[in-house]
Amino acid sequence: MSEINHRYLKDNDGNRYFPVTHVDAIRGLESLIKDSGWVEFTPVNGKPNQAFKDNDDKGYNCSYRTIEFLDVKIKTVRLNLSDISYGMTIYNFPDDFAKESQSWLVRTPANRLPVTISLRPSGKLSLSMNYIDRDDWVENNYIYGSFTWIE
């Protein structure tokens, strides 16, 4: 096997160094990245919840975020909601907010099974729960969680 020829740059004292760049040294980088920041939304059903909102918990409200870099989109939905019911619509995003259907599990109280959240290309964000929990879910039971996907 042959050796690959390396060239090292040397500083003024003759010491080798590896040149790298810093994000601040790239002109126009801001124009390549678009960030919506966290956009809070009011659920159409259910109630915004206060779970995990103590100073130490640093919990969040129902919100979403989109970050675009070149042709890549990173999307996140965060939920903190109580007073929910089986099959209810949580929110209606614009059409194509999600190009493909997305589903994920979120946290619930310890005496409940996880709840499945579904987001459809139509923009409908809804939930479903296990049949064991459907009839006796109480107002102060909550869902809490976030989900991120790449398009």
Descriptions of predicted regions:
Residues 40, 53-107:
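Beta-rich globular "head" domains
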